[in-house]
């Protein structure tokens, strides 16, 4: 059963962010996943999952990552603002760029004025500051840093606008019919929406890149020769 719930946990681990705009997908700390008996056929298992997990989200999906089989769903197609869960798609495109050889973990990126201007969660990049892809990934995943994520986006596509176009193209390729991205970070923007089902789909694509687990499983790290601490607020990785 650990394999079956892996995607659900990965969705929670990305960037230490567990929320849509107005509702967290939570796992009760007292639940025993081993008590869930999942049929081998396509029999719905919503009842069994619902009795075991304390789910308080407006929408939720539990998907088996290898087959795409949905084990539990609640309003799976409702369009909601994804906040920093947006970074799942951003990270997927960065992983794919690394696989293509367009970037490496040692590639040095110079922060633009635009990247440094991002609000919300950030590592306070200065315009002209340089940082490796590896460090920007750490900042994006562990601290959900919007400036770091934007710097990566610009390195992949030349601009955030160009990167967002790639995000929407990739979403369409994955069949994410309830998703439209307006930025790479998840900062509030009208029409920037996705659904629980689409989050599961893009998460399934992301975790096929084993490199991402080097970042999503980290509790604490640092940047700038130890001068800037990174702490993952997700208690599941502590």
Model regions and ranges:
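Domain-terminus/edge residues, biased toward the C-terminal soluble/receptor-binding domains
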Residues: 1, 173-180, 188-238
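Sec-dependent N-terminal signal peptides of Gram-positive bacterial secreted proteins and lipoproteins
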Residues: 2-21
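Intrinsically disordered, low-complexity regions
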Residues: 16-17, 24, 118, 227
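Active-site-adjacent loops and short helices of periplasmic peptidoglycan-processing enzymes
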Residues: 22-197, 204-207
């Amino acid at each position: 059963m650990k394999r079956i719930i892996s995607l659900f946990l990965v969705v929670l681990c990305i960037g230490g962010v567990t929320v849509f705009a107005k509702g967290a997908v939570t796992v009760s700390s007292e639940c025993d996943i081993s008590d869930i008996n999942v049929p081998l056929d396509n029999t719905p298992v919503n009842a069994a999952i619902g009795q075991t997990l304390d789910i308080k989200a407006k929408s939720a999906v539990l998907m088996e990552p290898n087959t795409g089989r949905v084990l539990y769903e609640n309003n799976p197609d409702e369009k909601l603002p994804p906040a920093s869960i947006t970074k799942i798609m951003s990270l997927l495109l960065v992983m794919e760029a690394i696989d293509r050889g367009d970037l490496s973990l040692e590639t040095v990126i110079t922060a633009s004025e635009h990247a440094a201007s991002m609000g919300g969660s950030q590592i306070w990049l200065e315009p002209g500051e340089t940082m490796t892809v590896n460090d920007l990934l750490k900042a994006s995943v562990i601290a959900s840093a919007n400036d770091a994520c934007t710097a990566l986006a610009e390195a992949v596509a030349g601009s955030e606008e160009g990167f967002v176009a790639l995000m929407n193209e990739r979403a369409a390729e994955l069949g994410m019919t309830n998703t439209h991205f307006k930025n790479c970070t998840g900062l509030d923007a009208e029409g920037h929406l996705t659904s629980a089902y689409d989050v599961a789909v893009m998460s399934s694509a992301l975790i096929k890149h084993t490199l991402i687990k080097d970042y999503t499983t980290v509790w604490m790290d640092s940047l700038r020769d130890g001068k800037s601490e990174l702490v993952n607020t997700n208690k599941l990785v502590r």
